[in-house]
């Protein structure tokens, strides 16, 4: 018959696919939602509910993480709302606006939020609007708003120790403009993984299957 191996959830498999296998290593998943996660020998209990933890795929350690409900979902929403033809056109428009979007700020809470403040009722906001703001400003503000949310998560994770480098996976990792915005806001170096950025979870699941059939340890 066909051998069946026990796998894991999306976050468990993505950690393996991103190559995060040692204590203190971190990665960022930038997709419809987003999170930053790092491996830890011990579980992390946060009474303020800013972070969570799950077991790693091998069950030997833990993945400590903070997550945003809407990341790429905000970009997709803005792309439709402002009738932007493609992700490439979105990036081109946003890159023509200076950092800070001339004072226009976006809060990316289109479906509530998880980290660092868990609030099901949180709502998205554009504020600081003036007559000088054009469509391009709103697009830039969306990218920066998500970046600021990720920076808040990283600030909490840094209470556990210094974080200077992050591997990045997910569909959002294809955007050079967005990655630069996030790197600047989070003050980190972002490293693309060698596998396809949006296939990390699949790679992790394949690794679990390989271990299950004895292909490798």
What are these regions (language model features)?
Residues 1-169, 173-217:
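Active-site core segments that coordinate phosphate-bearing ligands/cofactors
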